Amino acid sequence: LVDADFLETESFMKNNHVERTSGEEMASLLARLERHIGSWLENDDLNSINGRRTEILKACLIAGENDRGLFHLTVPTGGGKTIASLAFALKHAVRHQMEHIIYVIPYTSIIEQNAQVFREILGQDNVLENHCNVDYGDSEELKPMQLASENWDKPVIVTTNVQFFESLFASRSSKCRKIHNIANSVVIFDEAQMLPLEYLKPCIAMMENLMDFYRTSIVLCTATQPALDSIFDQHRRYIELCPNINEQFKFFKRVIYENLGIIEFDTLIERLKTEKRALCIVNTKKCAQQLYEQLSGDGVYHLSTSMYPKHRKKILAQ
């Protein structure tokens, strides 16, 4: 009702000249995905990384036929959960005539990466990226996206935890416009372990409300599932989408941690210089800047939240 009021006012003020487009149907998007992954599905070599990813992908496609409800996708890092979760969501949406897929992600850097992957598979006009770093500006070409960000009238939405829960808890009418497009959707919480602890109970209560009264399915998608069972209703059951979880984690285990204790700054620099490929994460922006200045040269990059988002994108592209 709130969104209809806004849309009617907009239509009147613009003499019925509406610039909004809702994107393609879910069946069409599923067909796009199936064309993209068609050759992957032939790989059944479980001794290869791609074969393991295909096993998870196939399981998600099959699981899409399940009834609405709560799902977990516990996939180790490198297991292809971005495409696998999209495959489940599209199959599930087509099966139940659901209208939207909403990705809820804690970090804008992950949002930007995932949104780009989805655009490449599903087409630019079908994916809405909505967070504080997106500025559609006054571009006529991007006007439909700017308008869609007001009420999430696109088939696939990629957004933040803050944007999603504010749309449900805020008392402002402009935020309420999205609620009817959250209903009858598949909502995927990527990196679900990052849900803020101090707000966990109301967030879980809202998820249950969406499942019980808004024809919505919830997917908690992560490599490390948080212990949420005690917060959900005790009668609430979930379906795990990843096959043979323990086996997958053993296969994808490619990191060994070694505690070096406290080391001097100069020692760290010398250690980094001996490595062909290395990622160094430090506690402060200042320290990261100092390291970069000491190491700067071909193949050395500096990433920090003190940079503008466009600058970070440029560095990541390099």
Outline where the language-model segments fall.
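Walker A/P-loop
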Residues: 67-89
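Conserved strand-helix element at the start of the C-terminal RecA-like helicase core
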Residues: 100-111, 271-296, 300-303
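Conserved helicase motor
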Residues: 108, 128-142, 283-286, 301-317
